[in-house]
């Protein structure tokens, strides 16, 4: 695909006022050319960009903050998260898992790609765009060289055909060669989106395709290469440290189609225009006048004919002179007879009989013009009929050309379905298709003063198809691809209040009636109250949830060459919890406290042995359930300080798990960011500082590369405790008009302290790396 980006044709004409709009530079020397179609560039370009997300079930629109904000831009490139809260396996764009349990999502039906969520854009997180002028964002960040470096480029484009219909695309490419052996990653994603926001009909459509390839190295063979390099006679660079696996890959391809549309029944009313809409109207009016002026000038100019000869324009140079009635002219019709009254005037025309009446008509017209100039007519929906189509297709291959001797504890077949990939080679395939239709009816909130809440009801049917290896009979040397299909029916509803400034709430539920999920229930409630306190607004929010869910299909059964389980008797996992969030904007304080109880906790586990020669042997992995109750307590404080140009941001999280053997958590997790923020020549905003991430020691989840999942360390004899080591970055983050850019040195403290630079057992993080990044916004 070819992407042509055209920036402003005369950049000196446009000046950023700093308030989100551009104005013309009066000192420009560009001459006016009436035949030049780009002359509208002399006028202010409207830059209003509105972004929002949509609910995956109902298609409800929620305004969103644009993802082009400059603060912490330098941290947005890491799969460890903006606040460093994720564990990863070293290289960027590799699988990850949050250390903050309450922020972990539910296990997805095709969990193999869930750890790559950093490189994906789910429909309910994707930002749709409505823009007054074509909008383009180009972002690029880079580090390292051709042997070990990283490259990331993202191109976003959005344009509106009119004020209702918007379209665009998002192209995203992540490529990391890896500082350690056999750990390269390559991810490409492309998304096409469209939205139509009409009065009665609304539509959101998103098509995405992803192609992911990741080399798996199984970790380094000996942690002492990192923690005690002096124990070796030779010094090893990062790319010389031996790894457990080589020539092993995971490939994940997926295609997604999301369509949500609705038909509204309601009435019209008038509301005031926003400032951006006023700017857009002024721009359109000025453009129309400009076109008219250019057309008039063109018609009045002398030009050359086809032979190059001068021709006279067609405009008359003198006014015509009246010469009286032509000879022989007649008056049409009969003259009125003597004594006959003239015909009555047209009674349908407005007759102005006095100056007072003329003034009144002018006042009415002026009032109408003022109303049209400052207000708009909007449609107020009363009832909506909603349909949502959600199609997801996944295909995964775990491939290996070689496996270490004794690395796997079990082998369930020798060859793939084509009779190849025998011996120590692997070719495991897994596929999943879901076609889900949801139909809903909504009674909208706020269509009159008595409609204090909105009410929705829905019906969903989800057709699912799974494919993976199976054996015709035990002892077969080759597998065949077996298919499983099921249909799931669920019903539910929502009661919500989102309008107003003081009190909001939302209650939604889903109940499964058929399929393997029959009997599953999901209930969620959240509310918030805003009230004044000491001259500031205080927000108090609360959340509660109850889930009784069946483990996913691949948690219940999974077949591959070396990992195999059939857990058809697994119980439903039951989770219940409450959370409170207390926020004071004036003091930059936010406190979150959450309590959750889990029964039949379902988790991944793995175990292996390491001999004296650092060989990994007897690898086993699977899905397990803890029948007892697990209690989880979480408290998180966000506190920011400011003293002149000095800013200090902090996030401190405390967690306690009643069963750390199956649900391990760090007791304390800290993110801190200290920086100076100042202006250079009144245009360039600079953030100059350092941030750090730290967590206390705990038995962090290991990584099972055969299924791309983090798993509990079940081998008590060889499990590894991680933590107690800070990761420190220093950076200069800058913002100039519509451009963001940064220079960063990540992990500047490499080799200091206990040198435990691991976020997963045997997977060291990258060392000290110089990184740069830039992001441009174009409005033209």
Where are the language model's segments positioned?
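Exposed, low-structure sequence patches enriched in small/polar residues
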Residues: 207, 241-303, 312, 341-347, ...
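Membrane-proximal, glycine/serine-rich, low-complexity loop/turn segments characteristic
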Residues: 8-258, 262-343, 347-348, 530-537, ...
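Sec/Tat signal peptide C-region and signal peptidase I cleavage site
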Residues: 3-7
């Amino acid at each position: 695909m070819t992407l042509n980006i055209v920036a402003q044709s005369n950049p000196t004409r446009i000046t950023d006022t700093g308030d989100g709009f551009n104005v013309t530079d009066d000192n420009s020397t560009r001459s006016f050319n009436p035949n030049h179609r780009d002359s509208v560039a002399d006028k202010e370009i409207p830059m209003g960009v509105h972004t929002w997300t949509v609910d995956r079930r109902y298609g409800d629109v929620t305004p969103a903050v644009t993802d082009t904000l400059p603060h912490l831009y330098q941290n947005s490139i890491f799969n460890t998260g903006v606040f460093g809260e994720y564990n990863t396996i070293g290289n960027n764009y590799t699988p990850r898992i949050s250390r903050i349990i309450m922020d972990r999502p539910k296990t997805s039906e095709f969990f193999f790609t869930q750890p790559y969520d950093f490189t994906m854009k789910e429909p309910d997180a994707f930002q749709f765009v409505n823009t007054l002028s074509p909008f383009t964002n180009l972002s690029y960040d880079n580090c390292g060289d051709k042997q070990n470096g990283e490259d990331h480029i993202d191109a976003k484009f959005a344009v509106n055909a009119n004020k209702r219909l918007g379209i665009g695309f998002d192209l995203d490419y992540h490529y990391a060669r890896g500082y350690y052996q056999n750990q390269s990653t390559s991810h490409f994603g492309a998304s096409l989106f469209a939205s139509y926001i009409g009065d009665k009909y609304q539509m959101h459509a998103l098509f995405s395709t992803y192609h992911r390839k990741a080399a798996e190295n199984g970790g380094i063979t000996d942690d002492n290469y990192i923690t005690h390099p002096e124990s070796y006679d030779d010094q090893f660079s990062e790319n010389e440290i031996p790894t457990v696996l080589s020539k092993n890959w995971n490939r994940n391809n997926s295609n997604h189609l999301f369509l949500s549309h609705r038909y509204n029944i309601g009435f019209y009313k008038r509301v005031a225009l926003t400032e951006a809409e006023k700017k857009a109207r002024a721009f359109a009016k000025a453009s129309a006048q400009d076109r008219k002026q250019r057309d008039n000038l063109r018609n009045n100019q002398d030009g050359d004919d086809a032979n190059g000869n001068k021709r006279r324009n067609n405009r008359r140079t003198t006014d015509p002179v009246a010469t009286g009635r032509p000879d022989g002219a007649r008056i049409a019709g009969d003259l009125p007879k003597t004594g006959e009254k003239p015909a009555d005037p047209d009674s349908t025309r407005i007759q102005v009989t006095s100056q007072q009446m003329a003034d009144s008509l002018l006042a009415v017209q002026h009032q109408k013009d003022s109303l049209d100039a400052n207000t708009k007519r909007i449609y107020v929906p009363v009832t909506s009929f909603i349909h949502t189509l959600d199609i997801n297709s996944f295909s995964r291959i775990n491939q290996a050309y070689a496996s270490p001797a004794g690395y796997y504890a079990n082998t369930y077949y020798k060859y793939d379905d084509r009779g190849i990939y025998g011996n120590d080679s692997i070719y495991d395939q897994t596929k999943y298709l879901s076609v889900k239709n949801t139909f809903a009816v909504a009674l909208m909130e706020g269509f009159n003063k008595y409609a204090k809440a909105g009410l929705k009801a829905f019906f969903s049917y989800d057709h699912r198809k799974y494919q993976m290896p199976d054996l015709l009979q035990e002892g077969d040397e080759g597998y065949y691809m077996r298919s499983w299909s099921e249909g799931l029916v669920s019903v539910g509803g929502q009661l919500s209040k989102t309008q107003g400034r003081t009190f909001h709430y939302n209650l939604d539920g889903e109940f499964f009636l058929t399929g393997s999920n029959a009997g599953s229930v999901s209930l969620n409630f959240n509310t918030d109250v805003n009230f004044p306190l000491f001259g500031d607004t205080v927000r108090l929010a609360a959340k509660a949830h109850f889930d009784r869910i069946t483990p996913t299909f691949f948690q219940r059964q999974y077949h591959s060459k070396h990992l195999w389980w059939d857990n058809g008797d697994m119980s439903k996992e039951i989770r219940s919890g409450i959370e409170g969030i207390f926020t004071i904007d004036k003091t930059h304080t936010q406190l979150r406290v959450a309590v959750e109880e889990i029964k039949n906790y379902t988790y991944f586990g793995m175990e292996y042995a390491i001999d004296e020669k650092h060989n990994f042997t007897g690898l086993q992995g699977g899905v397990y359930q803890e029948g007892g109750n697990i209690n989880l307590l979480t408290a998180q404080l966000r506190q920011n300080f400011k003293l002149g140009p000095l800013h200090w941001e902090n996030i401190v999280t405390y967690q306690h798990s009643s069963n750390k053997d199956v649900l391990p958590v760090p007791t304390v997790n800290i993110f801190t960011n200290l920086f100076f923020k100042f202006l250079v020549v009144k245009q360039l905003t600079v953030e100059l500082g350092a941030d750090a991430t730290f967590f206390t020691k705990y038995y962090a989840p290991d990584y099972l590369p055969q299924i791309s999942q983090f798993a509990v360390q079940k081998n008590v004899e060889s499990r590894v405790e991680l933590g107690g080591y800070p990761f420190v970055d220093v950076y200069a983050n800058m913002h100039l008009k519509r451009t963001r850019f940064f220079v960063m040195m990540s992990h500047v403290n490499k080799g200091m302290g206990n040198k435990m630079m691991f976020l997963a057992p045997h997977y060291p993080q990258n060392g000290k790396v110089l990184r740069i990044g830039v992001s441009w916004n174009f409005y033209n």
